[in-house]
């Protein structure tokens, strides 16, 4: 198995960090740390084997990637769309399939229910 560390180092060309609240930064940094620790080391090997890393699904739930904008009274985190976008960006920067899984579950499954 090929083990990699963080495969992507983003640059804040437009100084977007200055526009984020501390809560948004915490959400983004939590997702980023999880991706770096759990996804980056295994994702290339999973892609080479044409296997979806199903064992990562509980972790996606753990970082709030499933329906983060669903109101708390319905079991969601009650976050805003910016937080959702930041989580999706962190997933996407490592693996589009993982980001697609989270966004489809959030918008096409959880939200309509």
Indicate residue ranges for each PLM-predicted region.
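Intrinsic disorder at enzyme termini
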Residues: 1-23
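Helix-turn-helix-type domain boundary/helix-start signal
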Residues: 17-18, 25, 50, 77
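Glycine-rich flavin
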Residues: 33, 39-113
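Mature N-terminal segment immediately following signal peptide/propeptide cleavage
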Residues: 19-36
């Amino acid at each position: 198995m090929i083990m990699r560390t963080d495969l992507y180092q983003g640059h804040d060309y437009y100084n977007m960090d200055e526009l984020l609240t501390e809560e948004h930064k915490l959400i983004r940094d939590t997702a980023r740390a999880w991706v770096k620790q759990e996804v980056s080391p295994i994702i290339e090997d999973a892609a080479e084997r044409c296997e979806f890393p199903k064992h990562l699904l509980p972790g996606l739930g753990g970082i709030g990637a499933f329906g983060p904008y669903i109101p708390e009274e319905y079991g969601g985190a009650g976050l805003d769309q910016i937080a959702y976008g930041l989580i999706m960006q962190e997933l996407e920067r490592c693996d589009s399939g993982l980001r697609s899984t989270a966004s489809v579950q959030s918008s096409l499954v959880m939200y309509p229910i």
